[in-house]
């Protein structure tokens, strides 16, 4: 029927890769996809990845849901350690479980403070919680607008090893990196693959629609009476029970991205994912430069009022109002957000919602003077995109000045 109606391939001569895509396969999806990804991704981070430990997920968000479900299933009271502020998608997922709580760790310009992390882990345990992991986005932190330093990563790793918990490393912006190659800090999973649950997504580097992702870990977990099993096996069982597997066709499409034409009518496997990411980085890098240039040009002489992060990776900078304006403190509350829309035609994202509840209890003003500014805009193309980006940042600068009472 399909051959007659649509002119598709004769099923008798269907290419094997298509037959595999739409037939029952290995429980983890097409083997070739995991093998190819393991080779290419592993080369970038000087690791030999075991394809059998790659669990396909629906983007990195699917990995977050999977790892949370795995530790929540026993019904035990669990406490998740995370940053203050942290990714809203993680706090939203954690909130779905009535017996899960978040213990957050305040950050400085290098990352979460190690001794505060240790304190929070122990505080959670003293209150009767099981603490399975620390969740973070260390590269291009969302929403923090910076990347953790190498020194701080090593300090964090020391704490989690001593305290016996895992790191869940959400890595959507690992390749959205603006630092020189020799200045980039190492991802956690390349430093200690047996201590880390690494979440990869293809969404930020050119394959957003199909939501392809992988969970990878070489950790071993104790399940009872000293018996240990690979975390990847438990994740596989959990994934099966939650029906979180990906479409094999989407995985095959992702595998195609990991190849390039060889000039002779065939294809060859990429030696790195950096060239693939560069097609997107060209746009993001330029957008970042426009954002930072205009902020400096328009607001740089008023540093007593304004500050912003200089992101080495990711999509965001955090903009802060540092001093009172002529009408008092500038609060990035709902009223201010509405004012930005109504008076200036600007949609901005306040930071306070990214702070977990316990962080706002410690500091009722957490994030109340900050906005998250994004530079991933790419709806228009070429010079039109550049002009649109510049116009938007200029409009924001006019609004920021108005909020503190600086004449324009």
Go through each PLM region and give its residues.
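N-terminal basic, amphipathic alpha-helical segments
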Residues: 1-13, 19, 236, 240-249, ...
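Conserved core of the PLP fold type I
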Residues: 2-163, 168, 174-191, 197, ...
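Conserved core segment of the aminotransferase class I/II
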Residues: 13, 124, 193-285, 293, ...
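PLP-dependent enzyme catalytic core of the Aspartate aminotransferase-like
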Residues: 31, 39, 48, 125, ...
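Conserved glycine-rich beta-strand-loop-beta hairpin in the small C-terminal domain of fold type I
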Residues: 86, 248, 272-292, 296, ...
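A generic structural signal for well-ordered alpha-helical segments
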Residues: 94, 160, 299, 340-341
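Glycine-centered flexible beta-alpha turn that most often forms the glycine-rich phosphate-binding loop
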Residues: 170, 353
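Short hydrophobic/aromatic beta-strand micro-patches
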Residues: 216, 318-320, 374-376
